Amino acid sequence: TFKIDTVTQENLDEKLSTYLSAGDLLLDLAWNIDANAIIGWAHDHGVIYLNTSVEEWEPYAAGATRNPTERTLYWRHMKLRKLTDTWGGKGPTAIVEHGANPGLVSHLTKKALFDIATSAIKDGKVSGIEQALSDENFPVLAQKLGVKVIHIAERDTQISDKPKQVNEFVNTWSVEGFYEEGIAPAEMGWGTHEKSLPVNAYQHADGPKNQICIAQPGATTWVRSWVPNMETTGMVIRHGEAFTISDHLTVWENGKAVYRPTVHYAYCPTDAAVASMHELQMRQWDLTENQRIMNEEIIDGDDRLGVLLMGHPYKSWWTGSLLNIHDSRKLVPKQSATTVQVASAVYAAVAWAMANPNSGYLVPDDLPWREVLGFAEKYWGGYHSAAADWDPLMHRNDLFKGWNNRKYDESDPWQFSNFLV
């Protein structure tokens, strides 16, 4: 039985208490319900909890007058840590940010590191990593492999027989969710190999300081990237995996971060969504009420979603899903490749949480990667995992090179400045 209701700051306790009791599972797929409020409630009432994003009641409050660092997911994660640190790792399981991405991509990152290391040992490309591989010590493994950059690299090529109309926002998932992420500051895990900060970058004053943000929308911050078998340009949309992956892969020595890769989303959505986001910019970020999530009208295309690890002996390595619309409909009728990827990743986390109901507060990187990937594998069309001969300076065609003051670091292709479009 489905019941439609509204949860507000004032009625959260009343509404949740009406439907939930200790031992139940609360699956939070809503937007603009404060994470601290709802996760705190679930913890206090013995309810298992899972969401796909860390939300606030009023994400647009204060607008441009708010410090860019306070408009980041890093800021929200620090608030969550202050709450959950008092729990001592105990209580009902509460997993945050476990959809496809953020979520399953954290496990794909570990699979990619495992596959790279296994191949590198077999091919005689590296030595001295056997212990880190055996222990699945992924921070040290990434460090020893020389991983410098990780893109959550996605290219969605799904097309429909219903063209986007003028002043219509079309997407393959939540329009409101894409809007909020798109207008927020570009945000990324910042690697220890990076030589200089981007223009208008801001650093954080407390916490692990593993991230930076840029005072411009993620939707207008484009980088070069790659998915099988094509080069892409993607938006540096803020996403929780940029925080958790870069945090979990940091190597610390005497309180100093001596190794960390740069980690961020590089998202190229459908042609209709790209046009919609461009139109949104023309409207001065005033979101139209005319919105559509493509589904049954999709006639072709796929959603290539995975992680691109760069800087190791194979140059680049992509691990992820190549699920197309035709195969996704065989798996789950009347659904798109995007919704099948996301829903199955949520299912994977739910399955684990139900089997482990008293594990306290967790991010995706805390879960057993093989087990969770196993739950979702069928619905992702299996996992493609292979090397790629690519870096951001290859095939780069700068039409005004030498005249535009654009400088490239030829000595280190993995500098963030080399990726920027």
Positions of the model-derived regions?
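N-terminal Rossmann-like NAD(P) cofactor-binding module of classical short-chain dehydrogenase/reductase
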Residues: 24-27, 50-51
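Alpha-helix C-terminal capping/helix-to-coil transition sites in glycosyltransferase folds
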Residues: 21-22, 109
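Local beta-strand N-terminus motif with an aromatic residue
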Residues: 22-23, 92
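C-terminal catalytic/substrate-binding lobe primarily of soluble NAD(P)-dependent oxidoreductases
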Residues: 115-421
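N-terminal glycine-rich "phosphate-gripper" loop used for MgATP/nucleotide binding
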Residues: 7-9, 27-35
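Conserved Rossmann-fold cofactor-binding substructure of NAD(P)-dependent oxidoreductases
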Residues: 6-20
